[in-house]
Amino acid sequence: MLNPSRFRILAIGKVRKSWIQNGLEVYRKRLPGLSITEIRDGDIKKESRAIISSIKKDELLIALCEEGEKFTSMDFSHWLQNLGSSRIVFAIGGTNGLSQEVKTSADLCISLSALTFPHEMARLILAEQLYRAISIAKGSPYHRE
């Protein structure tokens, strides 16, 4: 079964829009144990070092970028389930995205959509998709096809 405490989101910059903060709070309550860490934005090399240095040996790094692999919600849930008990860190870049170094270091690059979203919104969409993935795994009626 999927456990939110296995997931960590590393995101560059702060969420400044209150409606996104409110949305993230909803999903933090629905996903107890989900960790969201903000990394100070600035120089992309410093951001990269901060992301890479924070990954522990037992964690998989998943980089979110537009050229990454695309999943349906069902496929995303099944993919997470197939990872077993692995701890997963999702890295979300700032206004300049993620460096090539982070993308190359990642175990996988995924895309939330063919559309481009502001980095703040990407956090909210990812949190919702993690909740949806867990709901699918539980057989909850939250996800409808």
From Swiss-Prot:
Keywords on record: Cytoplasm, Methyltransferase, rRNA processing, S-adenosyl-L-methionine, Transferase
Function: Specifically methylates the pseudouridine at position 1915 (m3Psi1915) in 23S rRNA.
Keyword Transmembrane helix annotated: no
Principal subcellular localization: cytoplasm
UniProt-listed Enzyme Commission number(s): 2.1.1.177
Binding residues annotated for S-adenosyl-L-methionine, in chain numbering: 64, 93, 112-117
Protein name: Ribosomal RNA large subunit methyltransferase H
